């Protein structure tokens, strides 16, 4: 059996750098907030695109910078690594409300000094009614107020955050440099006829782009100067390194990159600044092994660099990637536990001419991720039927290390799904993962995952059973649709479900479109728009429809609970009549507490078929229920529809991240036997310990979902023990299982936690002994010890599969 030694070790300095990051306590940093406030105050009357550009300029010119003693790649997001900057133009409400509780959280803890509290309180009045959250809330129609007041539709992930779920055009950045963008913008700006009123906004957009390009150039130059100054007092080897850093930072990202080292520094500068400009998460690297490979090959062929040096730079990049952090509101942490940034790196897949895209750099990316063993980046391997078998084998070896990576996405499903929705074939073949399991065309996709409303299927089912009244809040959400206790048939219940889920889908669209309009007006992101095609050609930001493609996925939680609930009702109540409608309803209201209710619960759990066991009876029920949602969602375009991009439509997605825990807390007892306030099933995975027929049966159940319609991702988590994969024959079985799932069953995605239940329980009891234990939460990995106990318990409770 291979083990971590197979991939080699970090160099001493990278190992030291990694340990520093692991040991660093994350603090709240007010620096960015102060500089943003200063810029907004000084530019109150400027058009919003210029205000945003001048804000970024002020931050990049004045924020503190530093170069760590162990690093070869430079650039920092905050005043200290792993500290979280504040973005007041999005919201200050939760920041001020939670100033004294950040350190007291159950999970996602942040520390804060009294001086930082004072600084944040001093700027808060300026933002009182002057940021995205305030203006977005004011825009929300009264029609959706009941859903916002009761928390049925959360907005923490929308009104508090910026552009997300995308990858910019790194390939063009490296070939043209920002200088190439600058030259194009100057030309287009000079050609504008300002007598045409439509060109006034374009003129200001181009001005904003030029300001931001210059600001990025200045930021890099500051590091060039600092490295040169530090070289004066450094020993010989480090002096040479610092002088090389100085040379590179004087060149990129403004100039095109000429070698691998320049390219990786250029990419990092932009990846970093995108997350200084905006606090959107899931800002991803795209197809890293494809756009970086020409630089790698040239340097290797010319003897300019060695594989060991490349791996050290990759290790360095992933450690720097882990320094980026984000503080969320307490409410938001319930759906994004572990302070995830979801910065995805995609490797493998196919070229645009349909050949296997695996190259030597693909293997080195695997090796570096194995060496660093960090939750960032979020590594995805694109699988296809002709994937290099040695590469696939190495990916499984990385997975065995227990970081929950890589995840596997299936070209055989995703590419046709994109083409069906109007994506050009060459672009579809170039897709990458952009966060958890969501996918997009890098550099051409204006995707903003506003589906953070989380359509809670089990809670909606309870509304359909309760005559349109929400069981949790006791508020009426939809028009009367009948009481379950008086329904004459199962079909009557399904008709009520259809009515309710369609109404709530419409309401979610109203919420999301309103917030998107507010985002468009208040927080356009200039650098991000510059680097996504063809915002410059159209002179529009991403939010205005500047991207070539623009799609939004809705997110759903509790799919397995919905399936199991419907099956239990149909079989035990209507088909076999073992439980009366009143008995079931009373047991739900009682939360299965009384002896009679516990008897009902036992029947629901043990005598009804369960999703995840390849039983059509239950699997096809959830497909029918899902179809109502998908059919309704497709009716509603997003705010960029007919404004330039191809698409402008919505589709489904199951990337519920850790929302199954928070959503479960807000959901009463359900007909599958689940008790109130306990977690729902996550993604498209079966409910805990309900999948009794092994992993093949799970794959078959999941493959029956309308995968081609769930283009936003069909997230499937599986769990096996490290001991199981110690045998080579079991590893081969797992490889064949994944191939069958993708090739024959047309599965979308799968990822594995390779960790024992005993290890997780010990880590919960003795966190100091497991500081670098990483687990797969949902479509991302996180350090186990930073998760709340509820999320830890949810992961511990997942089924351990045999092979």
Regions found by a protein language model. Give the residues of each.
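Conserved catalytic cores of very large enzyme subunits
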Residues: 2-206, 237, 241-244, 248, ...
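Extended non-globular scaffold/tether segments
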Residues: 203, 207-219
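Extended, non-transmembrane alpha-helical coiled-coils
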Residues: 218, 222-225, 229, 244
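A conserved hydrophobic secondary-structure block that centers on an alpha-helix together
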Residues: 230-237
């Amino acid at each position: 059996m291979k083990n971590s030694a197979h991939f080699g070790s970090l160099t001493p300095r990278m190992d030291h750098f990694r340990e520093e990051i692991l040991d660093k306590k994350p603090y709240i940093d007010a620096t960015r907030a102060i500089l943003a406030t200063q810029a907004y105050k000084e530019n109150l009357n400027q058009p919003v695109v210029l205000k945003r550009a001048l804000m970024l300029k002020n931050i990049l010119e004045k924020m503190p910078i530093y170069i760590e003693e162990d690093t070869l790649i430079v650039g920092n997001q905050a005043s200290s690594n792993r500290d979280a900057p504040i973005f007041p133009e999005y919201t200050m409400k939760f920041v001020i409300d939670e100033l004294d509780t950040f350190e007291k959280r159950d999970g996602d803890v942040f520390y804060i000094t009294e001086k930082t509290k004072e600084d944040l309180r001093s700027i808060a009045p300026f933002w009182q009614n002057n940021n995205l959250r305030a203006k977005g809330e004011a825009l929300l129609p009264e029609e959706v107020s009941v859903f916002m007041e009761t928390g049925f539709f959360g907005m923490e992930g929308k009104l508090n955050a910026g552009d997300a779920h995308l990858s910019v055009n790194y390939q063009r950045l490296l070939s043209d440099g920002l200088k190439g963008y600058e030259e194009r913008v100057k030309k287009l700006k000079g050609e504008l006829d300002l007598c045409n009123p439509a060109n006034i906004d374009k003129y200001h957009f181009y001005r904003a782009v030029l300001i931001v390009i210059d600001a990025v150039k200045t930021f890099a130059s500051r590091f060039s100067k600092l490295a040169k100054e530090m070289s004066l007092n450094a020993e010989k080897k480090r002096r040479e390194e610092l002088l090389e850093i100085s040379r590179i930072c004087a060149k990129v990202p403004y100039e095109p990159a000429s070698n691998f080292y320049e390219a990786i520094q250029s990419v990092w500068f932009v990846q970093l600044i995108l997350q200084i400009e905006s606090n959107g998460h899931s800002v991803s690297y795209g197809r890293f092994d494809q756009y970086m490979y020409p630089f790698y090959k040239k340097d290797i062929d010319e003897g300019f660099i060695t594989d060991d040096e490349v791996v050290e730079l990759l290790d360095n990049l992933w450690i720097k990637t882990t320094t980026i952090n984000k503080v969320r509101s307490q409410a938001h942490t319930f759906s994004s536990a572990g302070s995830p940034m979801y910065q995805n790196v995609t490797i493998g897949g196919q070229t645009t001419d349909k050949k296997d895209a695996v190259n030597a750099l693909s293997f080195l990316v695997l090796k570096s991720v194995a060496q660093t063993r960090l939750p960032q980046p979020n590594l995805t391997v694109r699988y296809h039927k002709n994937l290099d078998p040695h590469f696939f084998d190495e990916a499984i070896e990385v997975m065995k290390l227990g970081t929950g990576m890589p995840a596997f996405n299936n070209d055989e499903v995703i590419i046709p799904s994109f083409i069906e929705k109007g994506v050009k074939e060459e672009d579809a073949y170039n897709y990458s993962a952009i966060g958890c399991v969501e996918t997009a065309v890098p550099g051409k996709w204006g995707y903003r995952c506003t589906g953070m409303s989380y359509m809670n299927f089990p809670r909606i089912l309870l509304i359909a059973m309760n005559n349109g009244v929400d069981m949790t809040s006791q508020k009426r959400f939809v028009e009367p649709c009948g009481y379950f206790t008086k329904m004459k048939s199962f079909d009557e219940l399904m008709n009520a479900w259809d009515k309710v889920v369609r109404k709530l889908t419409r309401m979610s669209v109203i919420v999301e479109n309103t917030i998107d309009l507010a985002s468009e007006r208040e927080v356009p992101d200039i650098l991000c728009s510059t680097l996504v095609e063809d915002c410059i050609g159209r002179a529009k930001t991403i939010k205005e429809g500047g991207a070539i493609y623009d799609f939004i996925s809705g997110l759903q939680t509790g799919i397995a609970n919905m399936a199991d609930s419907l099956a239990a009702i149909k079989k035990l109540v209507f088909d076999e009549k073992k439980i009366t409608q009143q008995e079931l309803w009373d047991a739900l209201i009682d939360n299965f507490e009384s002896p009679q209710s516990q008897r009902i619960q036992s029947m629901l759990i043990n005598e009804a078929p369960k999703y995840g066991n390849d039983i059509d009876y239950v699997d096809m029920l959830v497909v029918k229920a899902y179809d109502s949602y998908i059919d309704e969602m497709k009716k509603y375009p997003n705010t960029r529809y007919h404004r330039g991009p191809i698409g402008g439509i919505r589709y489904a997605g199951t990337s519920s991240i850790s929302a199954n825990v928070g959503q479960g807390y807000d959901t009463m007892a359900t007909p599958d036997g689940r008790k109130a306030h306990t977690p729902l099933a996550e993604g498209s995975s079966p409910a805990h310990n309900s999948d009794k027929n092994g992993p093949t049966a799970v794959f078959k159940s999941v493959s029956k979902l309308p995968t081609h319609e769930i283009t936003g991702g069909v997230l499937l988590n599986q769990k096996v023990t490290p001991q199981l994969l110690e045998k080579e024959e079991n590893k081969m079985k797992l490889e064949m299982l994944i191939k069958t799932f993708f090739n024959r069953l047309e599965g979308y995605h799968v990822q594995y936690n390779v960790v024992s239940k005993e290890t997780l329980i010990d880590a919960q009891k003795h966190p100091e002994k497991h500081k670098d234990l990483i687990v797969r939460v949902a479509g991302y990995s996180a350090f186990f010890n930073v998760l709340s106990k509820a999320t830890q318990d949810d992961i511990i409770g997942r089924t351990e599969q045999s092979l």
